[in-house]
Curated annotation (Swiss-Prot):
It comes from Lactobacillus delbrueckii subsp. bulgaricus (strain ATCC BAA-365 / Lb-18). This is Arginine--tRNA ligase. HAMAP family: Arg_tRNA_synth (MF_00123). It is found in: Cytoplasm. The lineage of its organism: Bacteria, Bacillati, Bacillota, Bacilli, Lactobacillales. Monomer. GO terms for molecular function: arginine-tRNA ligase activity; ATP binding. A motif ('HIGH' region) lies at residues 121-131. Its EC number is 6.1.1.19. GO terms for cellular component: cytoplasm. Disulfide bonds: none annotated. It catalyses: tRNA(Arg) + L-arginine + ATP = L-arginyl-tRNA(Arg) + AMP + diphosphate. Pfam families: Arg_tRNA_synt_N (PF03485), DALR_1 (PF05746), tRNA-synt_1d (PF00750). Belongs to the class-I aminoacyl-tRNA synthetase family. Keywords: Aminoacyl-tRNA synthetase, ATP-binding, Cytoplasm, Ligase, Nucleotide-binding, Protein biosynthesis.
Amino acid sequence: MNGKQLVAEALQAVLPDWSLDDIDVKIERPKDEKLGDYAFPTFTLAKTMRKAPNLIAVELAEKIDQGSFEKVEAVGPYINFFLDKSQTGAAILQEILADPENYGARDLGHGRNVLTEYSSPNIAKPMGMGHLRSTMIGEAIARILAKEGFKPIRIDYLGDWGTQFGKMMAAYKMWGNDADIEKDPINTLLSYYVRINREAEEHPEYDEDGREWFSKLEHGDEEAKRLWSWFREVSLERFKKVYDMLDVHFDSFTGEAFSAQMMDKPIQILREKGLLVKSQGAEIVDLEKYNLPPLMVIKSNGTSTYITRDLATAMYRKKTYGFYKSIYVVGQEQEVYFQQLRACLKEMGFDWADDIVHISFGLMSINGQKMSTRKGNVVNLEDVLNESVDLARKQISEKNAGLKNADEVAKQVGIGAVVFHDLKNYRRNPIDFNLEEVVKFEGETGPYVQYARARGESLLRKSGITDFSDADLTKIGAEEWDLVSFMARYADTIQKAMETYDPSAIAKYALELAKRFNKYYAHTRILVDDVDEDVKKARLAVVQAVSHVIKSALDLLDVKAPDEM
């Protein structure tokens, strides 16, 4: 039983009309740890008990059975609980050590499907640093959902349809060199795309050429289909190489082209329900009652817009997966669009429209510079990951020249550093990326957290102890309690991250645990002869528990935890 449950049960004994759940949601953690481990505010009792909250706190504190606590005291309108450090600490450690992989997990999902769409790069263009945010936020959310008992279904909705591919084909037909494409397909195709956009300013006919090629693709022209399939194949091959580096794996790569085959159904429903309204030659859905701008469905030239594919996709996914939630990890510039998508689905009569969730995020800049594929100043993600690994390798060789499997550790540290930097920031905030800062072993970085755990693992190896089943875990003191009580917050942290779809809660937790452990490591004597053997073993059990929890937290962020660095 965790500390919060002990507090809830002690309170229910003196508040019999309250359920455990009602009490549980009111229990807080004091901002100042000197005020106790938990606090219960009495404001909501004032009306029924007809007393001032301060008096209620004093009265209840006197009635509470203090057997499981060091002390219970009233401070103003709050009842503050100080847990029995040795007994509660031993119980927390036992729970971690007994089943480290599942520590912190709560079966809140009961196996329900949650679709998570993320990454979604465009074919025939390299994955840039701009894709990192969607990819890693989405992957972390999927891992957090799995930890909480949901079944995440990971979807990479490839940008493999649209007028830009017509432009790519037109550019290829004008300037394409097959030898160059075979050698470096994506970067060569990108150079054509950048060139046609640049030169279209003086040659507007290039834009028309692009539209014609896309029209050919829509109507099944064999050459257009051949080029499209080729562009898609070489792109996906390259994307999977980057995903393997990041340890990201999808259940589906069906993209916009797949959805384009199903557009007739949503348009049919919109027509049958009389939702399509003529406006300046186009057809729109009026969403004024939702305080949203009108949604263009069919352009004045008769072609459908992006929304028809997204409507068709949402309908297909609900029918295929019966999802509990369908999450889209897409930049915050699309917020209004996803509100329109939900509103349109509601108008079409789908009661599951509110289960569509848009997880937005802020833009990433590189050393203060914005990125744009259209203008050609995209920063290649694969190049950044490789450079980060090289930097990590250099630092590791300086710290530990004789490290075995140094190359593998360099990959784990270098790639982990890039991922951790992305995820430690609240997802809606814009972030700036500076590689040298990101890979440092000091400060709020991934390598700092990884190194803290590696130090703990080194201590455990030196001790030679691998089994703590006979350890007297009540031998922990105040120094250990600082770590153990913080590890008890892990489950709440995971739940908060899940409810807010915010992996930064996990990253911040991992950083704080690493900081507390480093302080403990620096000030506590463990592997010395004059420390009592029972105390020594209890302290090593704490080190083992910290190692388990840091590894678990990093895994939720898709960051590796090397045992040596």
